[in-house]
């Protein structure tokens, strides 16, 4: 194999390579076995024509196209490896020379991964993160957990307030015409939850059970049902019940009820403090990581990105998002129907920062190379086990989707992030 790479632009060039006689012979054998199955020749059973007879009747050249298709993928892959390039798209291949008894010569117009010139990526200044947990933080979390244990109690002859739950019938219309999804009976709605159209819940505040209320609202201009977007609607609402929250007492019994690992309210508060501390530390570490990696990306010099890389990133984000929906039991068709969106809408959404994500990935890969980062077999095994547990899959199933090289790449990128983040310096007034 002989391969030559000639750079033409920032991210593209021409790869010239040869297919030697041995490989050509292998390809011709494959091609002949394929075509002779369908040849009827007087004096021979179908599919049994000798090679010499075929060559005499049709010429060996008749096999060249099929032979090339048989050996080209391996030959191109070998040429790419020899030239040391990293293609990001399907090449445009041309045959330059294809003569009997000589090596075949081909050229491929190839788009390659941009060459990244790293700037500063260690010791970067990042804003100092707060990791302090206050008494107020603990009290707010305690109150949140208390709210979760609240019971709904019927409010007799009392006006509804924000935070109350009302049981209602409603029927909506636009210009006097009912619309799909605009009616329901005995619907429980928490006022102030903002789960209905803006303004709907506010107009029920102050009303009592057994009252009839006309609620007038305007659908948002970006409402998912286009036929309703921006239009005024009137809802006839009947309030059946008004229920208020009855909160449990904050005492030792409450603590033991919601957490079997504690015996008192003080123990619960201490446990909450430790949990909040861990959450705040994790959030601070993530903020440092995000800021430092973003700065490292800004400091790097990266040529204009090939569109193929941006498109691949958009499709990757799309598949990941839809995959997450599938895990929740929502297939793509159902998701598009529920949200009133299309695949193109999602692609436009992910296209917004696709360029930034690709550049970040390129910089992290460059750091892996600069730092000579490698993943051990033990780390690959641990990553495989972690992914299997995360997605509730057998390790063999994960391995069928992710090769060792892919796992090593992901581990290397994680280590590169650690190199950047661990060396970052927290500064109070960092920009």
UniProtKB/Swiss-Prot annotation:
Keyword hit for Chaperone: yes
InterPro entries the UniProt entry points to: PPIase_dom_sf, PPIase_FKBP_dom, Trig_fac, Trigger_fac_C, Trigger_fac_C_sf, Trigger_fac_ribosome-bd_bac, Trigger_fac_ribosome-bd_sf, Trigger_fact/SurA_dom_sf
Catalytic activity: [protein]-peptidylproline (omega=180) = [protein]-peptidylproline (omega=0)
GO molecular function: peptidyl-prolyl cis-trans isomerase activity; protein folding chaperone; ribosome binding
Alphabetically ordered keywords of this record: Cell cycle, Cell division, Chaperone, Cytoplasm, Isomerase, Rotamase
Location in or out of the cell: Cytoplasm
Record-linked PROSITE patterns: FKBP_PPIASE
Stretches assigned to the PPIase FKBP-type domain: 163-248
EC identifiers of the protein: 5.2.1.8
Biological process (GO), any one: protein unfolding
Origin superkingdom: Bacteria
Gene3D superfamilies to which the protein is assigned, alphabetical: 3.10.50.40, Trigger factor ribosome-binding domain, Trigger factor, C-terminal domain
Predominant subcellular localization, coarse grouping: cytoplasm
A single Gene Ontology CC term: cytoplasm
Disulfide bonds: none
Described function: Involved in protein export. Acts as a chaperone by maintaining the newly synthesized protein in an open conformation. Functions as a peptidyl-prolyl cis-trans isomerase.
Entry's family note: Belongs to the FKBP-type PPIase family. Tig subfamily.
Domain statement: Consists of 3 domains; the N-terminus binds the ribosome, the middle domain has PPIase activity, while the C-terminus has intrinsic chaperone activity on its own.
Name listed for the protein in its UniProt record: Trigger factor
Organism: Latilactobacillus sakei subsp. sakei (strain 23K)
């Amino acid at each position: 194999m002989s391969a030559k790479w000639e750079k033409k632009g920032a991210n593209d060039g021409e790869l010239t390579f040869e297919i030697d006689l041995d490989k050509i012979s292998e390809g011709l054998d494959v091609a002949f076995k394929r075509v002779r199955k369908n040849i009827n020749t007087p004096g021979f059973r179908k599919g049994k024509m000798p090679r010499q007879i075929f060559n005499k009747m049709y010429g060996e050249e008749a096999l060249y196209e099929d032979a090339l298709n048989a050996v080209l993928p391996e030959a191109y892959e070998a040429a790419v490896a020899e030239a040391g390039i990293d293609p990001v798209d399907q090449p445009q291949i041309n045959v330059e020379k294809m003569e009997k008894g000589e090596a075949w010569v081909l050229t491929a117009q190839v788009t390659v991964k941009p060459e990244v010139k790293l700037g500063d990526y260690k010791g970067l200044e990042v804003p100092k993160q707060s990791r302090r947990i206050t008494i107020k933080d603990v009290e707010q979390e305690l109150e949140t957990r208390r709210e979760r244990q609240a019971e709904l109690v019927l409010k007799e002859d009392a006006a509804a307030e924000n935070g109350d739950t009302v049981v209602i019938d409603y029927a909506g219309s636009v210009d006097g015409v009912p619309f799909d999804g605009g009616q329901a009976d005995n619907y429980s709605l928490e006022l102030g939850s903002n789960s209905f159209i803006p303004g709907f819940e506010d107009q029920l505040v102050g009303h009592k059970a057994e009252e009839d209320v006309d609620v007038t609202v305007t659908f948002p201009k970006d409402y998912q049902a286009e036929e309703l977007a921006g239009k005024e609607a009137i809802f006839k609402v009947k309030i059946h019940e008004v229920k208020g929250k009855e909160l449990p007492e904050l005492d030792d019994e409450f603590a033991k009820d919601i957490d079997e690992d504690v015996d008192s309210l003080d123990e619960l508060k201490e446990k909450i403090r430790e949990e909040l501390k861990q959450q705040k530390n994790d959030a601070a570490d993530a903020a440092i990581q995000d800021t430092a990696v973003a700065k490292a990306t800004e400091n790097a010099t990266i040529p204009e990105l090939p569109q193929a890389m941006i498109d691949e990133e958009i499709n990757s984000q799309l598949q990941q998002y839809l995959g997450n929906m599938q895990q929740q039991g929502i297939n793509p068709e159902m998701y598009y129907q529920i949200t009133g969106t299309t695949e193109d809408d999602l692609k436009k959404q992910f296209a917004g920062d696709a360029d930034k994500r690709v550049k970040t990935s390129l910089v992290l890969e460059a750091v892996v190379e600069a730092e000579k980062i490698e993943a051990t077999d033990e780390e690959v095994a641990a990553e495989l086990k972690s992914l299997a547990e995360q997605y509730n899959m057998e390790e063999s199933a994960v391995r069928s989707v992710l090769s060792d090289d892919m796992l090593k790449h992901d581990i290397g990128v994680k280590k590169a992030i650690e190199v950047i983040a661990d060396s970052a310096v927290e500064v109070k007034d960092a920009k």
